[in-house]
Amino acid sequence: MEIRHHLSEELLLDYSSGALSEAWSIAVAAHLSKCSRCRASHAKLEEIGGSLLTDSTPEELSDDIFSNVLERLDEVGASVGNEIRKNSGWASSYGIPSVVADYLAADTKKLPWKNLGLGVSQVVLKTKDKSATARLLKIPAGRKVPHHSHNGRELTVIFSGGFSDETGSYGPGDIQEIHGNAEHQPWVRDGEDCICLAVTEAPLKFSNVAVRLAQPLIGI
């Protein structure tokens, strides 16, 4: 598996410093569990952060800085070190890492998939995050997602299958970061359904009027 699309330096820095909320952190940790290159970059940031902590006086450190750093280390350690244990069943067949599987049922047949139309299904992860939503998506092979833009940032991590859009081609392990009003229309590859994690901070802006009218019902 060759990963071509990686985390931005800004995302890695925010994650390492504990600045990301739960939903965004899940997406970053999911990619880190797949990508050795980004794990190495993350380790360097942690090393730099550790040096800064050592050189700082107690007055310069916030009360929760240590807990933030330790929390990030625990998340990555769990998603990487426990992946075999957590993914010994159905999750491994979809490439879903433990950091995501922990939010899901033990059996894919028991997942509360919600039909969004056109064969697309979702499961919204139950997090405590009030600023962003994380959802597992299943999109049929060969399907085009309706053309849309965004009201904010969107992160998508591919677990199985893949898609292409105006920004490139994405496969297992890749992460796509979309900002602001960027427009695209993902097209899932033929031959295999696409299973991915998508995190958004605001509803999508669909070009098709009918899809926009249905948004309150499908919740995306």
Language-model regions, residue ranges each:
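Double-stranded beta-helix
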Residues: 197-220
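A short glycine-rich, His/Asp/Glu-containing loop-to-beta-strand
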Residues: 111-141, 146
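Glycine- and acidic-residue-biased ligand/ion/polar-headgroup-sensing regions
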Residues: 140-143, 149-165
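Short acidic-glycine-tyrosine-enriched beta hairpin
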Residues: 165-185
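Positively biased amphipathic helices and basic secretion/translocation or surface-docking motifs
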Residues: 1-8, 22-24, 33-36, 40, ...
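Short beta-strand His + acidic residue motifs that chelate non-heme Fe in jelly-roll/DSBH
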Residues: 42, 145-147, 166, 184-190
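Ligand-binding loop in jelly-roll beta-barrel domains
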Residues: 182-205
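Short Cys/His-rich Zn2+-coordinating modules
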Residues: 13-22
